[in-house]
Amino acid sequence: MRDRLKDPVKIFEINKGKRPVHIAAPMVRYSKLPFRQLVRDYNTDIVYTPMILAKEFLHPKGRYFDFSTNDADASLILQFGVDDPVILEKAAQLVGPYVDGIGINCGCPQTWAIQEGIGSALLDEPEKVHKLVRAVKSTLGESFCTEVKIRIAKDLNKTRHLMQVIEKSGADIITVHGRTRQDRSSFPVNLDAIREVRPCVQIPVVANGDVKSLRKGLEIAKYTETQGIMSARGLLENPALFAGYEETPWGCVERFLWYSTSYSLNFHLFYHHLTTMMGQMTTKRERMTIPKDSFASVMDWLDEHFVVRRPDEPMFGESVLPCRRY
């Protein structure tokens, strides 16, 4: 039985009128269990899995490869890439007992996703989105948290209509990415668009795009009048973002090392996470010397250059600044 207080809807209720809910975005490859555990240590309220293809999730090998969790992995929303309500019903039935919510991806702009009829291809099919929401609700119950993530359209009336369809379908949360599916990630997020469409529904709306710091996120929430803020790249660079740190604290790196070994994170993902979060505490030249062959060799490199505390040592995971060895 999942903890009712970890229900994403309950979290929005608890924070109403206080502060926006802090959310770690679904990131392909990167939103794995060790990273989810890490950002929770730093004031992240809700975390997502990477987008998982629902049709692959129906196969045991697909589930094993894409999804792992534990009792501490809450509040957790699993995001599906899906266009078939029947497949979604089956996938929801399999995963329902192990998550706190299911998200439906209607925002992925990648060409392959659009060709598959998932992600932002669904922005043009409100009726299908309605059926997908109903598939989750009919399978897991009306009280089970269901979220839909969308992008804005060039015609905001189209976005408003889709949001209203989503709300009437019974969804509990809508996340709005402030770029169109044609916009590159380097294109500035359109906060005015999020601000304009938010009042068209009564359920919580989350602003997504360019949340690179807590300060920036709070400014976005205030301007758009949204109830939540979602960060992706900002959290990759600084998993302690929602705790107010402007740069990754050293203790965050120590915790990440521990979680990665505890949950056997894929080495290539581990390497990318580590070098990204150490971007502001090391030079590019230094990072180029970090070994690329094994976790053990990376640990040797870190121990050679920094004081790295282990979980059984005082001040593990608490330091702000790294202590270098010279």
Swiss-Prot record:
Cofactor(s) needed by this chain: FMN
Active site: C108 (proton donor)
GO molecular function, one term: tRNA-dihydrouridine20b synthase activity
Entry annotated with the keyword Cytoplasm: no
Reaction equation(s) it catalyzes: 5,6-dihydrouridine(20a) in tRNA + NADP(+) = uridine(20a) in tRNA + NADPH + H(+); 5,6-dihydrouridine(20a) in tRNA + NAD(+) = uridine(20a) in tRNA + NADH + H(+); 5,6-dihydrouridine(20b) in tRNA + NAD(+) = uridine(20b) in tRNA + NADH + H(+); 5,6-dihydrouridine(20b) in tRNA + NADP(+) = uridine(20b) in tRNA + NADPH + H(+)
Homology family: Belongs to the Dus family. Dus4 subfamily.
Name of this protein: tRNA-dihydrouridine(20a/20b) synthase [NAD(P)+]
Species assigned in the record: Schizosaccharomyces pombe (strain 972 / ATCC 24843) (Fission yeast)
Lineage: Eukaryota, Fungi, Dikarya, Ascomycota, Taphrinomycotina
